[in-house]
Amino acid sequence: MAEVFTNALKRSVGVVTTSSSGSIGANATTITGISTAAVAVGYLVDNGNFIGGAKVSVIGAGQVTVDSTSTNTSSTTTQTVNFVGLTTIYASTGQKSILIGGTLANNTTNQVSATVQVSSGSTSYNLLYKVPVPAGSSVVISDAGKTLLNASDEIRVGSSVAISLDVTLSILQGVA
């Protein structure tokens, strides 16, 4: 199979839902006392009590279950929790590919935080996590290195502010 360069482009990336009344138990996987409207399974949990990349795995009435344990050693209340939806920018077409590089451009007048993940099945890995992108500026992905993508991998991007980023990725498809 011949190698082919392609660009993956998305405009206005960013889906965010915020709840400011969360309760998180010590070393817990559940956040209670929150509104779950507009929250979806797979959304990132943005709160200082969970490691980067923690995701919503189950949604219940007024609570969510997270796929990792909280890091706090005692229960905490009135927590602000952001739920960040990831947008799939690139999905492999059944062949190995290489992420050559990319740019995240901030289209807003305020700084935003960007997250870029490679997802392989149900497992995701952060390429960038909560990287600040100044107002009217951009961040370059893989400036010095390349990232190999397996045949079923996806690249997903999230932002701390809704519809705030334009994303361009350069990808070499069909590598052996």
For the regions a protein language model found, what residue spans apply to each?
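Short, surface-exposed beta-strand/strand-loop-strand elements in extracellular ectodomains
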Residues: 109-130
